[in-house]
Swiss-Prot record:
GO terms for cellular component: cytoplasm; SCF ubiquitin ligase complex. Residues 8-26 have a biased composition (Basic and acidic residues). The lineage of its organism: Eukaryota, Metazoa, Chordata, Craniata, Vertebrata. SUPFAM superfamilies: F-box domain, MIT domain. GO terms for biological process: fat cell differentiation; innate immune response; protein K48-linked ubiquitination; protein ubiquitination; regulation of TOR signaling; SCF-dependent proteasomal ubiquitin-dependent protein catabolic process. This is F-box only protein 9.
Length: 437
């Protein structure tokens, strides 16, 4: 087959030489036909054509086509890389100016064009055109700045304004804007936001408004007062925490913006029936509620009523629920690095009015006694929430007789009836503030 192809190519060449008086269009057509035949024969027998039967015009046409395709692909790759380089350097400049969201957009577009564009850039020159990215420093100064967002925002406010303003009005208004207030007044407002209930969650949400509010919300004095209110004298030293805010967030503590709830269910046998084939069984359910306050007070209630009807009554200590137990608690951290909560609670005392008018009765001595309950709980975390679980470790009843001063202690066995208490946040508990921090 290769011999036939060579004979066809020679015959075509002789025919072109004999017919020298043909028009240029016909000569181009014959040349294209000759190239097509040679390429077709080369595709049918690639091994033979590459070694013996491939003619010089066939090799020249194929090499020119491959070279043109390679040049086109190379130009496209260079253009794509140059565009990615410009986008990346523009993102660097936006990041230096503080426009982080715009920088992220340019970074994303550059990475979509060339994934490893970061390693192909030389930072000694700026791209051709508008000169974006000039003055870029390869050191990690900007990275360290962004790691400490507080100092970064403080520096930005100092560079932008000759007179320090924490915020600026977004729209023009005839009313007085909050940016006019001095720093001392703003900090006092922030202390009202935290309030005596230690609503640090609202403070964190307030810090998202602007850079100035972020700086105010990170004020060390606010977080120091919050730590002192929770742990008292036991938190005088900041070590091993880096800041008061880190201590408040990381150190184990009970939560105040909700209530700890547990549900206990068991089945007991009912009364005997006259019918021997029927036995009554009852499913009993009851709840335990524990509410902690920052000033050291605690409330505990055991009732069969469900949370929707009980939780609103536990907002303050001045509740009218008769079965409520009131007391104080303290936090204790053992050598095994486990935090425990110990509380002493008593039933709310009720003064009964005595009516002695027109009554005569014999005085009978009644032995008065005070009842108190001692509770021990282990504080731990579960799931994605922190410090949201209390596990029973101790429960006892102490009866003190006033006449003799003796105290009788009855300890309860901690079994499966003492289910762990899980925390549930209640928004109404921090809906308004009564006193500042």
């Amino acid at each position: 087959m290769s011999a036939e192809a060579e004979e066809d190519c020679h015959s075509d060449a002789d025919r072109v030489g004999d017919e020298g008086n043909e028009s240029p269009a016909e000569r181009d057509l014959q040349a294209q036909l000759q190239m097509f035949r040679a390429q077709w024969m080369f595709e049918l027998t690639p091994g033979v054509g590459s070694s013996h039967g491939e003619t010089r015009p066939c090799r020249a046409g194929r090499s020119s086509m491959l070279k043109a395709a390679a040049d086109t692909k190379g130009r496209q790759e260079l253009a794509k890389e140059e565009k990615a380089r410009e986008l990346f350097l523009q993102a660097v400049e936006e990041e230096q100016n503080g426009a982080l969201y715009e920088a992220i957009k340019f970074y994303r577009r550059a990475m979509q064009l060339v994934p490893d564009i970061e390693f192909k850039i030389t930072y000694t020159r700026s791209p051709d055109g508008d000169g974006v990215g000039s003055g870029y420093i390869e050191e990690n100064e900007d990275a360290s700045k962004m790691a400490d967002l507080l100092s970064y925002f403080q520096q930005q406010l100092t560079l932008q304004e000759s007179v320090l303003k924490l915020c600026q009005p977004e729209l023009e208004t005839s009313q007085t804007h909050i940016s006019v207030l001095p720093m001392e007044v703003l900090m006092y407002i922030f202390r009202w936001v935290v309030s005596s209930d230690l609503d640090l969650r609202s403070l964190e949400q307030l810090s998202l408004v602007c850079r100035g509010f972020y700086i105010c919300a990170r004020d060390p004095e606010i977080w120091r007062l919050a730590c002192l209110k929770v742990w008292g004298r036991s938190c005088m030293k900041l070590v091993p925490y880096a800041s008061w805010r880190e201590m408040f967030l990381e150190r184990p503590r009970v939560r105040f913006d909700g209530v700890y709830i547990s549900k206990t269910t068991y089945i007991r046998q009912g009364e005997q029936s006259l019918d021997g084939f029927y036995r009554a069984w009852h499913q009993v359910e009851y709840y335990r509620y524990m509410r902690f306050f920052p000033d050291g007070h605690v409330m505990m209630l055991t009732t069969p009523e469900e949370p929707p009807s009980i939780v609103p009554r536990l907002r303050t200590r001045n509740t009218r629920t008769d079965a409520i137990l009131l007391g104080h608690y303290r936090l204790s951290q053992d050598a095994d690095n486990q935090t425990k909560v110990f509380a002493v609670i008593t039933k709310k005392k009720e003064e009964k009015p005595l009516d002695h008018k027109y009554r005569y009765f014999r005085r009978v001595p009644v032995q008065e006694a005070d009842h108190s309950f001692h509770v021990g709980l282990q504080l731990c975390s579960s799931g994605h929430q922190r410090f949201n679980k209390l596990i029973w470790i101790h429960h006892s009843c102490h009866i003190t007789y006033k006449a003799t001063g003796e105290t009788a202690v009855s300890a309860f066995e901690i079994d499966k009836m003492y289910t762990p208490l899980l925390f549930a946040r209640v928004r109404s508990y921090t809906a308004f503030s009564e006193r500042p921090l």
